[in-house]
């Protein structure tokens, strides 16, 4: 049964944030609100959590998960990013974008796209998520909470608790966007839109 945690969206209570961090550090799987709908999240070393996320979303082993980072200092440990791309990405973050970039050796091999050795990263514009990432001290491995047959991510914590109570360890109630991220692939050196979503794509076209 999932723990239901109602955290203030503007002033997240540290005690409640720490409760969620404890779940993550115990290899738990959480559902949490972001600026692009709800997402599933686990800590970096949680191998079993990857399989649990795949099972919930009916994903195959080729699905690429995202590293949700607190800031550029953290993001820079996991991807290679040159000055020109850095300026472009920085102008769009924090925000509802996922950027595909070449992975560093800090990225677990199971998270890399095998042919390109790349990984998706993002910095969300969401106070609650920022508080969670600060307390955790590392990125979350994450995927949009988009259930099989749905076209948009789930946006209500209590509905997620009701529907996925037996397969999650915690659900955070909070404000969430209604569209998934816009995905921008920089692995060729130039931006290519892989998915249109909440973020304005015109700055990359």
Question: Which residues are covered by each model-predicted region?
Answer:
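Active-site-adjacent structural elements in enzyme catalytic cores
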Residues: 1-205
């Amino acid at each position: 049964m999932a723990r239901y945690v109602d955290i203030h969206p503007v002033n997240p209570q540290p005690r409640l944030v720490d409760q969620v961090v404890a779940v993550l550090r115990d290899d738990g799987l959480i559902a949490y609100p972001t600026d692009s709908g709800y997402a599933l999240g686990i800590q970096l070393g949680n191998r079993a959590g990857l399989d649990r996320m795949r099972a919930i979303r009916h994903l195959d082993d080729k699905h690429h998960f995202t590293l949700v980072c607190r800031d550029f200092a953290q993001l820079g440990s996991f991807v290679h990013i040159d000055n020109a791309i850095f300026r472009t990405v920085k102008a769009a973050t924090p925000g509802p974008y996922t950027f595909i970039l070449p992975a560093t050796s800090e990225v677990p091999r199971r998270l890399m796209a095998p042919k390109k050795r790349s990984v998706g990263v993002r910095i969300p514009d969401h106070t609650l998520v920022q508080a969670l990432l600060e307390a955790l001290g590392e990125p979350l491995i994450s995927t949009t909470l988009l259930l099989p047959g749905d076209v948009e991510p789930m946006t209500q914590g209590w509905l997620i608790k009701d529907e996925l109570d037996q397969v999650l360890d915690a659900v955070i109630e909070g404000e969430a966007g209604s569209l998934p991220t816009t995905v921008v692939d920089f692995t060729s050196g130039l931006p290519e839109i892989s998915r249109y979503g909440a973020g304005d794509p015109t700055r990359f076209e």
